[in-house]
Amino acid sequence: LTEQKKLFSTDRRDVHTLAEDINGADVFVGLIKGNVLTQDMLRSMNDNPIVFALANPVPEISYEDAMASRPDVLMSTGRSDYPNQINNVIGFPYIFRGALDVHARAINEEMKLAAVHAIADLAKQPVPDVVNDVYHVNDLTFGPKYFIPKPVDPRLITEVSAAIAKAAMDSGVARTPITDWEAYKQHLRQLLGQETKLTRKLHDTARLHPQRVVFAEGGNPTMLKAAVQAKTEGICQPILLGNPDRLKRVANRLKLDLEGIEIVDMRADNEQGRRATFAKHLAEKRAREGYTFEEAYDKMYERNYFGMSMVEQGDADAFITGLYTKYSNTIKVAKDVIGIREGYKTFGTMHILNTQKGIYYIADTLINRHPDQDVLTDIAKLSAGTVKFFNDEPVMAMLSYSNFGTDTAGSPVKVKNAVAEMQKEFPELAIDGEMQVNYALNKQLRDEKYPFSRLKGKDVNTLVFPNLSSANGAYKLLQALSPEAEIIGPIQMGLNKPIHFTDSESSVQDIVNITAVAVIDAYVEKIKNNK
């Protein structure tokens, strides 16, 4: 026997066959040939047996036969069409990656064990949406059918490689130590193209200034996962609205750890005092709009009224909502509780599209159905400020179906007038219109046909659409045609406080991204108020 095989040899004289040997065993690891393990053999094993049937393409016992023989078996094969595939790809590439990055002199046992622990720990963490999408499931969680990470899990490169590198350093075989682990993990994520500079910058900035963020639909699995992920990443201090017992049941089902996360039941008796305080403030604020204290108090049983009031009264810094409620209702609550910034008639939303051609800012994608000239002007002002908020310089095109007065009636006129108002108030701003979208995005075409434009020689990055249908349809069309494009939004602009929205289609990562925006928004708001 080779030295490796001698580790598994025995001097027992009472076993001569696999059936005798496996009786009462806890673990079976097979690397031999197909169909050598029978259902009777499997039934003879201890409770909750671990069976790794790794012969390929036919395992020692098929997955179907194993599961039919006993329900408590923890089963793995080497095949991708069954749960818990054991594949070299979840280990070897990242072991080599970590070893090479520290110029390790050897790959030792400490490093191998570090890989094992990193992979095992990863299986217990919430599963990224990208993994669920690949396998067409919604709720992969640690358990009998998922105790080994999937080979497509993008976190393997960061967690396993970093664990290997650290183990190499700790065991003395590394020649080039790593000092900044977060920078190292960012480098690894970039190798896979997992995150862009934009999202990385948002998350990094939010981590520097984490704020208290209220998540309205705490019992929604997607929002709950996002809140836990945001806390894990250090982006915010989550506050979940909802019934604590229900939230904990959902968290237990999803194997999510709620430790350190505040849960607020706005309908509970112990919140009577805050409901009264919030109602008094709302009734006084909207006294001339038909609000009585009793009506305002009743509204505080609703998550959006209560959650936004928490932000309004300083009990939280930002609010995320939208998965369950209609936008029209949420918009009304935001106007009632938070209010629109002084000097504006409305507020709006923007989506950021990070494409291969560059970053584009699109407005208004959610709020104003049929904006008039004044509302379009407000949207343009808010858009310019929001682009600057992201440390970019706005180059703005206000869009229509006509170009620079070719249609002197209908909606192009209000766009043209809004452009004139913006150019008068902000002569230094690069903004022009009305124009068709192809002229906005094709600098050469625009410069040749309309050389008088203020945008001559400039690449447009901000698109203001004439109404909600066109803006919303445009970003969703681009999203459908360019699935590789990263989209962040909707980003609220124009309310007095950081209130941000999601929709029923938002993924966990979408909500985490908008949470990072909300955190930065809240931090900037604090800086302004302290000046």
Positions of the model-derived regions?
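Rossmann-like NAD(P)-binding element
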Residues: 1-60
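Short beta-alpha connecting loops at secondary-structure transitions
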Residues: 3-14, 74-81, 96-105, 145-150, ...
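Short acidic (Asp/Glu) and glycine-rich catalytic loops that position anionic groups and cofactors
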Residues: 25, 74, 91-99, 124, ...
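Conserved acidic residues
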Residues: 26, 49, 73, 317, ...
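A short helix->loop->beta-strand "cap" motif at the edges of active sites that frequently abuts
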Residues: 46-50, 70-73, 497
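Adenosine-phosphate binding glycine-rich loop
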Residues: 53-161, 168, 504-506, 514, ...
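Aromatic-enriched
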Residues: 139-145, 156-195
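Anion-binding alpha/beta catalytic cores of soluble intermediary-metabolism enzymes, centered on
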Residues: 175-178, 184-457, 461-531
